[in-house]
Amino acid sequence: MAHRRYADVVGTLAILGGTGAQGMGLALRFAAAGESIVIGSRVLERARDAAARVRAAVPAAQVDGLENLDAAALAERIVLVLPVDGLDAFLGSAGPHLAGKLVIDAMVPLQVRKRVAELVAVGDASSVSELVQSRVPAARVVCAFKNVPSDALQDLARRLEGDVLLCSDDDGARREVATLVEHVPGLRPVDAGPLRLARYVEGLTALLVTMNIRHKALTSIAIVGL
């Protein structure tokens, strides 16, 4: 039997809102790990430009750029790194493209005031992940990649360190994301329980960002004892 590449087996991964710092960092790391990537943006030209930058950094990368809705329709696996203030409206229009699919929420609703990062309210939900699940009930939502600093993700010469906390009410979806995490050198997936605990994962990010500001560092999470 002919050998099949990893990207051919798992299919395309769409990163919606992928032109920002976190999205670009994830696109670079996933492309380097052999994923077939589509970067989504509200503006097609920005998506194509981001895809070109990934190809320049990872010459063998399979990456394209599309508008967010087109990227969501194309892929079976979705990563959300969209601006939180427009998320509710986006989910209203994109819901049919997300239903039944693996949806990885990597968003954190942060604001920084006087060098202190804090969470901001996200509609009627206690976390962004729970908001996504409530708006698209048929999506297989997993909270992941919320505590990995974007600057570290974007620096391919830097080996990542830390654990990726995974919260979900879908055990199969959590396992799929764990496999994705394992393909990124230096990261370890950790089952952190049901989706309702995503609020605490998001809170950890506020703490990490504040420490990064105070100590001029790039901190991440590592769980000892596991």
Predicted regions and their residues:
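NAD(P)+-binding Rossmann beta1-loop-alpha1 motif at the extreme N-terminus of oxidoreductases
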Residues: A2-R53, H183
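A glycine-biased structural micro-motif
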Residues: R48, L74, G100, A138-V141
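Short beta-strand and adjoining strand-loop segment in the mid-core
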Residues: V116-A125, Q154-G172
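Short, glycine-/small-residue-rich phosphate/pyrophosphate-handling segment
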Residues: G123-N147, Q154-D155, E176
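Active-site-lining helix/loop region of Rossmann-like oxidoreductase modules
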Residues: G162-L226
